[in-house]
Swiss-Prot record:
Belongs to the class-I aminoacyl-tRNA synthetase family. The gene is argS. Pfam families: Arg_tRNA_synt_N (PF03485), DALR_1 (PF05746), tRNA-synt_1d (PF00750). Coiled coil: none annotated. Transmembrane segments: none annotated. SMART domains: Arg_tRNA_synt_N (SM01016), DALR_1 (SM00836). Keywords: Aminoacyl-tRNA synthetase, ATP-binding, Cytoplasm, Ligase, Nucleotide-binding, Protein biosynthesis. A motif ('HIGH' region) lies at residues 125-135. This is Arginine--tRNA ligase.
């Protein structure tokens, strides 16, 4: 937000000139109610003790200095015990249009991240079956977060961790092998914990057609072959589903490569040398209690098998070795208990706490016409992400997944999200962009020419309260993006876009654009709409949602 950044810089200079230190608790906020200025600062309240002065007296002193320093300010009111309510000129707000025109698709970007290297790992579903709708929410959050952080000046790399070395993968191979035997008419028994979905039969049938001699193999070799084929087949499907959902992973990292490449053993040795790993009852343990965990954790069981945790430690060690300043893991909410031990691992690797963060994705309750759709991956009873995207479209699905805080449960009604009404959030926002484009097209058809370059004087007719409200809202875009990046919260963007769309729809309903009585206001209002369209398009792009020009 240009206004907030400008006010902050001015206040910091004033405090410095006073020979005082900038207080950590100083804030600049946008008042929720009208009549309290454009911005409110508490600087006099939190600086009074250090200055040895009454807060209101100090506020008066700061206000006088601020008036002399910033010509864009038209009023400073001292409220209550010493709050500074600051109002900026209409010319100042109208410059938002010029900045949007100049920046275009870069409007709202910043250098908040200062090039900090960040890795975002998301989805990382076991390649044991198609992605379901819960994976879709994690995919939308991860992909959008990466877009937002790049726009805010971070150097972001995205990654999918392929869990190809655990028990579930062995079960996958065994399930396909047994299904292949079944298709050949051989008697089989499929235990309860095996994968039973029709896709398992399809994979078995496909492999048998490609390799007629499959069943000539013994059980061990047959299971290995079925595992390799099934994993690659499912992984190819996952990649295609994500591409159709506009989700990109720059790196696909294999867990098996860590085990077979010796990285896990290397990590064990490192922990042992640091006195953080110990043998007990034939198993290898990690002293996670030294880092605040509620109990120590097993790395290698007494039978020699590795726990998931052991690979995860080696994986995160690998991440930091690649030079990332911040590692962000996006996990399902059922993994919340895993966070303390992973933080312990990061600390044991010698990394600072702020170098690791986790975004939790709560469950998606899939509904159809208000009725819950039952889902179970192993039983093969689930709605795939591909089916949902095919039915609702990627735009509606992504926006809906990003419409709420990621760690809050989400009801996703397949019928509701397809409605082309203002009750559908994605339609509401996309229609606002389409409405802007429609007005601009009609203006061109009527021969109304928009100047290639506008200036402040030509925008002077924009002076109404609703126009100033829109301009203040557009000025908040950069701050909203930066805040979403810092908080790892993509839903901040969707909420902001709903607010912008609402303001645009209200403005359009109240104010004539092309049929305005005063001719000198038509072009400025078109310029305002064009700036709104710029923000909507840029914001939707950060969510991976299209900005249609007509609907």
């Amino acid at each position: 937000m240009r206004a907030k950044k400008q006010l902050l810089a001015a206040l910091q200079d004033i405090v410095k000139d006073m020979g005082l230190a900038w207080p950590e608790k100083a804030t600049i906020d946008t008042p929720k109610a009208t009549g309290f200025g454009d911005l409110a600062a508490n600087i006099a309240l939190v600086l009074a003790k250090q200055a040895g002065q009454n807060p209101r007296e100090l506020a008066t002193r700061i206000a006088d200095a601020l008036r002399n320093r910033d010509a864009d300010i038209t009023a400073i009111d001292i409220a209550g015990p010493g709050f500074l309510n600051v109002t900026y000129s209409q010319d100042f707000w109208r410059e938002t249009i010029l900045r949007a025109q100049e920046a275009g698709s870069a409007f709202g970007s910043s250098d908040t991240g200062a090039g900090r290297k960040v890795q975002v790992e998301y989805v990382s579903a076991n390649p044991t079956g198609p992605l379901h709708i819960g994976h879709g929410r994690g995919a939308a959050v991860g992909d959008s977060l990466a877009r937002i952080m790049r726009f805010a000046g971070y150097d972001v790399s995205t990654e999918y961790y392929i869990n190809d070395a655990g028990r579930q993968m062995r079960l996958l191979g065994l399930s396909v092998w047994v299904r292949a035997k079944e298709l050949a008419g051989r008697p089989v028994t499929l235990p309860e914990d095996f994968y039973r979905g029709d896709y398992i039969k399809d994979i078995a049938r496909e492999l048998m057609e490609k390799e007629p001699g499959l069943l000539d193999l013994d059980d061990a070799a047959g299971e290995d072959r079925c595992f390799a084929y099934a994993m690659n087949s499912i992984l190819d499907g996952i990649k295609q589903d994500l591409a159709d959902f506009r989700v990109e992973h720059q790196v696909w990292f294999s867990e098996r490569s860590l085990v077979e490449g010796g990285a896990v053993e290397k990590t064990f040795n490192r922990l042992k040398e640091a006195g953080l790993a110990f043998e007990q009852d034939g198993a290898l343990w990690f002293r996670t209690t030294d880092f605040g965990d509620d109990k120590d954790r097993v790395l290698r069981k007494s039978d020699g098998t590795l726990t998931y945790f052991s690979s995860d430690i080696a994986y995160h060690d690998n991440k930091y070795d690649r030079g990332f300043d911040l590692v962000v893991d996006i996990w399902g909410a059922d993994h919340h208990g895993y966070i303390p031990r992973m933080r312990a691992a990061v600390a044991a690797l010698g990394r600072k706490p702020e170098a690791f963060d986790v975004v939790l994705i709560q469950l998606v309750n899939l509904l159809r016409g208000g009725e819950l759709v039952a889902m179970s991956t192993r039983a093969g009873q689930f709605e795939t992400l591909a089916d949902v995207v095919k039915e609702t479209g990627a735009d509606a699905a992504r926006f809906m997944f990003l419409s709420r805080k990621s760690d809050s449960p989400l009801d996703f009604d397949l019928e509701l999200v397809k409605q082309r009404t203002m009750d559908n959030p994605v339609y509401y926002v996309q229609y606002a962009h389409a409405r802007v484009c429609s007005v601009l097209r009609k203006a061109a058809e009527r021969g109304i020419e928009m100047p290639a370059q506008l200036d402040g004087a030509s925008l002077a007719p924009l002076s109404g309260d609703d126009e100033m409200e829109l301009l203040r809202l557009l000025d908040r875009f950069e701050e909203t993006v930066a805040g979403a990046a810092t908080a790892l919260a993509p839903h901040h963007i969707s909420h902001y876009l709903m607010e912008v769309a609402g303001a645009l729809h209200s403005y359009y309903a109240r104010q004539p654009i092309l049929n305005a009585t005063e001719q000198d206001v038509i072009v400025p209002r078109l310029a305002l709409l064009r700036a709104v369209g710029c923000v909507l398009a840029n914001g939707l792009s950060l969510l991976g949602v299209s900005a249609p020009e007509s609907m």
